Amino acid sequence: MKATQTLIATTKELPKEAVLISHQYMLKAGLIKKLASGIYTWMPLGLKVLQKIQNIVRDEMNKAGASELLLPSILPSELLQETHRWDKFGPELLKLHDRHNRDFCYGPTHEEPIVDMARDTIKSYKQLPLNLYQIQTKFRDEIRPRFGVMRAREFIMKDAYSFHENSQCLRNTYNTMYATYCNILDKIGLAYRPVKADTGAIGGDNSHEFQVLANAGEDIICYSNGSDYAANIELATYAKSDLSKRVNSQNTIEKIHTPNIKTIEKLCKEMSFDIKKTIKTMVIKDAGGNFFALVIRGDHELNETKINKLDQIIAPYTLATKEEIFSIFNANPGSLGIYNCPISIIADYSAIAITDLVCGANEDDYHFTNVNWDRDVTNYQIADIRNVVTGDISPDGKGTLELTNGIEVGHIFELEDVYSKPMNANIIGQDGKSKPMLMGCYGFGVSRVMAAAIEQSHDENGIIWPESIAPYQVAILPINYNKSDKIKEVADKLYQDLLGDGIDVLLDDRGARPGVMFADADLIGYSHHVVIGDRLLEQGLIEYKNRKTQEKQEITIAELIKILK
């Protein structure tokens, strides 16, 4: 492609809301242009990157035995009413009416239409398993769309849905899709981790997220430095302490005056306590109106997902109000503890491992020291209710856990019959009986992975794409292209030769100043830069620059061809 035949719309102007590097660089490089809040035009260079990602996704999905289709983006309300999502989805569901006043929505996901199609066309187990996918524009009316295409209202997603007769068949396809997502991200060239994830309201036994590692990631993921264990922070767990090795203390409880101390941090600072010897007692109320005292070590944080999954808790829970707490303890938050606690205690394993702990005295301005489990507090339950921290022992006992930030670009689920059952998507099984098909769903954020790639790899000058998805593999940057016949001749011939070799190449024939050409090339992120100028050309040389390494070489065109091949 010649630069004069496409639209290179680089700019120095940035809106104030462009906080993330990916958002800034996509706007500055002219990859996208904002049309409305959370809605973007894909400019030629941006679309080229997007299409390269789509091609990789499509190629790997086809290799995995999936078949592509395309579902409508506008969905009738009747389908979502069958699964009760018409009302449950909330304001993120963009609803509209046609001229006959019939209700429709812009599809946020496509479970209902794919099940509707399947129930009309799949009648027997003999037609299964079947894995269908699409690459489709979706819309979710985010209240505060932000971060550019990372969290836009309109976005492009690959969503696949598989259909099965039994759980083993579903698990086989799930494992295939897990491997396929790894292949996609490997082929793109991103550093990532598949992590065990919460199934949430969907349920089922299996769910994995695919997280691209980046400092700007909103998700926190943990992984073992000694094994392949990895999980989202919501689900991550740790090796439990051996409570049989806990030392029996001979120290007696002591009540100490702690005026105006309401936080663990202030308590440790003013009283010189080790925070790892303290506990926090927080009161919650579950959906059944039951109160519980949740106990974790002073330097740990509660994990909402784990708590809602406890058998004792009727989810969802809420934190008790200050008034509710005072009516139970006759004390305020910040002074609560486990000694003579009037409600049921659920303590984290790490809190249970502490000997001679420090806690609130259930009396304002007082704390207890030297409190011990099983001696002073005997009525309690133990559960994993906290977030893991760096240094925790991996649950498989191999290595310790480390935390990092990630950007979720893929998520796979075993849906089972969550959608097929309410929509009566039944088949005749091998036993001759009618039963709901089991399903898996597999989402991949095509537009989101583009932003994630920028977050993972960039410098102060612009984007450093993985070569597989760079808008152009090579940029020819001729100095004085429109003024020097010799420069033009060499540049044009090199351009044609590279095209003939199947190399994705851009010839910058705009006649722009060298500084502008070089800055644009760095900003846009072409993988290989070839500068053709009079001085080197007299020696039969050109200047080659690798965008990723920044290495420059003065080489012949023959040597350049070897590098590019």
UniProtKB/Swiss-Prot annotation:
Similarity section: Belongs to the class-II aminoacyl-tRNA synthetase family. ProS type 1 subfamily.
Catalytic activity: tRNA(Pro) + L-proline + ATP = L-prolyl-tRNA(Pro) + AMP + diphosphate
Keyword Transferase on entry: no
InterPro entries the record matches: aa-tRNA-synt_IIb, aa-tRNA-synth_II, aa-tRNA-synth_II/BPL/LPL, Anticodon-bd, Anticodon-bd_dom_sf, Pro-tRNA-ligase_IIa, Pro-tRNA-synth_IIa_bac-type, Pro-tRNA-Synthase_IIa_type1
Job description of the protein: Catalyzes the attachment of proline to tRNA(Pro) in a two-step reaction: proline is first activated by ATP to form Pro-AMP and then transferred to the acceptor end of tRNA(Pro). As ProRS can inadvertently accommodate and process non-cognate amino acids such as alanine and cysteine, to avoid such errors it has two additional distinct editing activities against alanine. One activity is designated as 'pretransfer' editing and involves the tRNA(Pro)-independent hydrolysis of activated Ala-AMP.
Gene Ontology terms: biological process: prolyl-tRNA aminoacylation
Protein name: Proline--tRNA ligase
Keyword list, A-Z: Aminoacyl-tRNA synthetase, ATP-binding, Cytoplasm, Ligase, Nucleotide-binding, Protein biosynthesis
Enzymatic class: ligase
EC number(s) per entry: 6.1.1.15
GO molecular function, one term: ATP binding
Pfam families with a match to the protein in the record: HGTP_anticodon, tRNA-synt_2b, tRNA_edit
GO-annotated cellular components: cytosol
Originating organism: Francisella tularensis subsp. tularensis (strain SCHU S4 / Schu 4)
Notes concerning its domains: Consists of three domains: the N-terminal catalytic domain, the editing domain and the C-terminal anticodon-binding domain.
Quaternary context: Homodimer.
Subcellular location: Cytoplasm
